Amino acid sequence: MEWVWALVLLAALGSGRGERDCRVSSFRVKENFDKARFAGTWYAMAKKDPEGLFLQDNIVAEFSVDENGHMSATAKGRVRLLNNWDVCADMVGTFTDTEDPAKFKMKYWGVASFLQRGNDDHWIIDTDYDTFAVQYSCRLLNFDGTCADSYSFVFSRDPHGLPPDVQKLVRQRQEELCLSRQYRLIVHNGYCDDKSVRNLL
């Protein structure tokens, strides 16, 4: 009889997982996304890392929209090289619009050559423009439509973090992206603020 209960338990676990659709095409994004309201400074509070070398902490992004409505971004943060050399580096991104105003193609590159470069999907999953934003990118799809290599940022307008009610909403969005418990917190300790004493690239 024990094996029967084991099968019942496995079936229950399987049905629980089946309730969440982890295909990238099923993920919802921000309705009627407004680039102009999104522009400005955002501080990365948490990050789900992709494969490759990217900014690791003290990440501050600046989004801007030009007179033609084209969005671009710059980001600065700390990177650790060779396991013991910390430097502050910059990345640049330009965005191409798609039919959905919250979904872009983002071409990005590091000002320093050792950083990753690419042309990824860049989706704004949710934002209230004034407090928080959740960004998502899938770089490689599995055959079943789920994501094999993704990254995601939780941004805040306030470098000191997000209020509790917003944190709860963000956790819900992370679960909807099938990325629950896969984020790490981003430290903001001013490492890249003092340009006179830090390594800059």
UniProtKB/Swiss-Prot annotation:
It comes from the Eukaryota. GO terms for molecular function: retinal binding; retinol binding; retinol transmembrane transporter activity. Substrate binds at residue 116. Residues 1-18 form the signal peptide. The keyword Transcription does not apply. One of its GO terms (cellular component) is extracellular space. The keyword NADP does not apply. The modification Omega-N-methylarginine is found at residue 139. SUPFAM superfamilies: Lipocalins. Disulfide bonds join 22-178, 88-192, 138-147. Keywords: Disulfide bond, Methylation, Retinol-binding, Secreted, Signal, Transport, Vitamin A. It is found in: Secreted. InterPro entries: Calycin (IPR012674), Lipocalin_ApoD (IPR022271), Lipocalin_CS (IPR022272), Lipocln_cytosolic_FA-bd_dom (IPR000566), Retinol-bd/Purpurin (IPR002449). Its main location: secreted. Interacts with TTR. Interaction with TTR prevents its loss by filtration through the kidney glomeruli. Interacts with STRA6. Retinol-binding protein that mediates retinol transport in blood plasma. Delivers retinol from the liver stores to the peripheral tissues. Transfers the bound all-trans retinol to STRA6, that then facilitates retinol transport across the cell membrane. Belongs to the calycin superfamily. Lipocalin family. This is Retinol-binding protein 4. It comes from Oryctolagus cuniculus.
